[in-house]
């Protein structure tokens, strides 16, 4: 029997998906992009739309199961929210959209709001948050909308099971979906209502098994989604959000860790947990109680309810890690005379001018801006006295258009001589490049401030035999790592002494903290 074409093969709400994807790039709070930078991250609206449209058939296809048509009619057909456009807002002529099941399904994926439609017809713009209607699958706010996600999951459930059994009715499929979904909710309630469930008693193990059985039973009747090049994890994440059993793989270890952090661990550990006050204090101590107060979580009748265990623990242990590391290396980052703590130090490597009569130590700067935005422009203005190069900090547009380091060649601001890229690399290979502390960026009550160095920063002693120093040799293929050819042959050489000292302290304290976490916490 010929199968119906999938919706993605026939039609997609491209304009709507594009609009929400542009918005997706600017969302920060709660977005997986804030976990770790990944250079080829796919927009979540695109992934959600593509996965959904790949799993459901075109309802106007002759081979589409009747149960799926009935599902659209029941779930979307009577809701004016999913009514097709009376006049498609992005076409140049009057263009009414037929009210049929396919278009209803497209409007469920993404539909411009009435305000946006009116503005588009008038040639006006609309704020990104207000472009799509509430209740659309791809809208950011729908990520945790139980009603919207339930519709999407039931449609996928119906499409998947009706394809295998074309004679089954939507009523029967709807009832089986509701029963399977309710079984998961009941199993979750039974498990997450238990007090001190991190202690693995026989009762807790039984309830954990019951929950896993309910989830497996549900997902056995849903399609599986596999992304062999998962990268930032957007496709596995959205497949899981739609109720499917999702699989992701990537050969890059950074991608693998990102996928663990964005897809696997939140699903496994990001659940509610209840503690007795005694057990909570035993695990978290006074610092944990302080965090409870800061988050507005109260102790009620000796019971503490944490809405999301993983979120709480990440914040708690992150504060512990930062406090331990700051205690050890904080003296390397002293506050200024006004008590403002540094956010960052701006250093530059310096090379020696190749002119024998000059020999100035020139910072390898490609540009002079410390801040260059539409609202704030701060730059370094060179002050040259003979072969001595210093800087002052000024606000406004920098009059110097190009830096002294251009395509690797260094132009000396003292004598005008050019030190070629080859000569600069030779100095680097012979360890002749030095470091110059140029500016400090501090956090004040008025925001970021930029200051000239007012202190001599101590360079810490580094034990290069320390187990936390990466002494491994780098690959010799220069096309894989851009630092090759500069005398950088081992990974630790990518960092300054200060950076190495801070990083080794960070890793050491992380290991200490990791060993303090009980095996029952995150098995």
For the regions a protein language model found, what residue spans apply to each?
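S-adenosyl-L-methionine-dependent nucleic acid methyltransferase catalytic domains
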Residues: 1-523
């Amino acid at each position: 029997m010929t199968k119906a074409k999938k919706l993605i093969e026939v039609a997609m709400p491209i304009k709507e998906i594009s609009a929400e994807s542009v918005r997706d790039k600017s969302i920060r709070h709660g977005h997986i992009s804030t976990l770790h930078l990944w250079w080829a991250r796919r927009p979540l609206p695109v992934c959600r739309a593509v996965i959904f449209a790949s799993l459901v058939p075109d309802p106007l296809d002759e081979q589409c199961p009747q149960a799926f048509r009935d599902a659209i009619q029941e779930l979307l057909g009577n809701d004016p929210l999913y009514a097709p456009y009376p006049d498609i807002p992005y076409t140049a002529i009057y263009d009414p959209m037929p009210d049929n099941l396919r278009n209803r399904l497209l409007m469920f994926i993404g539909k411009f709001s009435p305000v946006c439609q009116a503005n588009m017809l008038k040639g006006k713009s609309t704020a990104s948050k207000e472009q799509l209607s509430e209740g659309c699958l791809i809208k950011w706010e729908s990520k945790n909308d139980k009603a919207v996600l339930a519709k999407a999951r039931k449609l996928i459930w119906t499409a998947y099971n009706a394809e295998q059994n074309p004679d089954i009715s939507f009523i029967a499929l709807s009832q089986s979906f509701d029963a399977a979904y309710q079984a998961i909710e009941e199993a979750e309630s039974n498990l997450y209502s238990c007090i001190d469930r991190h202690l693995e008693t026989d009762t807790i193990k039984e309830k954990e098994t019951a929950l896993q059985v309910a989830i497996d039973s549900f997902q056995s009747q849903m399609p599986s989604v596999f992304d062999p090049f998962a990268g930032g994890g957007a496709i596995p994440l959205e497949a899981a959000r739609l109720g499917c059993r999702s699989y992701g793989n990537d050969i890059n270890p950074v991608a693998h860790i990102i996928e663990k952090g964005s897809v696997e661990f939140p699903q496994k550990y990001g659940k509610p947990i209840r503690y007795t006050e005694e057990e909570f204090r035993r695990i978290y101590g006074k610092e944990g109680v302080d965090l409870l107060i800061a988050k507005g979580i109260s102790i009620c009748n000796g019971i503490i309810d944490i809405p999301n265990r993983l979120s709480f623990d990440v914040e708690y242990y992150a504060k512990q890690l930062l406090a331990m590391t700051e205690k050890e290396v904080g003296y390397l980052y002293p506050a200024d005379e006004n008590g403002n703590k540094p956010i960052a130090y701006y250093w530059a490597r310096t090379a020696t001018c190749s002119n024998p009569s000059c020999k100035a130590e020139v910072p390898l700067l490609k540009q002079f801006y410390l801040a260059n935005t539409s609202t704030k422009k701060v730059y370094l203005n060179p002050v040259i006295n003979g072969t001595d190069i210093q800087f002052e900090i000024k606000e406004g547009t920098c009059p110097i258009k190009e830096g002294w380091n251009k395509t690797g060649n260094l132009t000396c601001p003292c004598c005008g001589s050019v030190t070629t890229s080859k000569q600069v690399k030779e100095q680097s290979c012979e360890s002749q490049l030095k470091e110059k502390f140029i500016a400090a960026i501090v956090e004040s009550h008025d925001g970021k401030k930029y200051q000239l160095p007012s202190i001599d920063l101590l360079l810490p002693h580094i034990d290069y035999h320390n187990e936390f120093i990466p002494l491994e040799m780098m690959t010799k293929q220069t096309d894989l790592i851009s630092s090759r050819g500069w005398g950088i042959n081992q990974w630790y050489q990518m960092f300054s002494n200060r950076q190495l000292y801070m990083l080794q302290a960070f890793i050491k304290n992380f290991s200490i903290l990791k060993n303090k976490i009980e095996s029952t916490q995150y098995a």
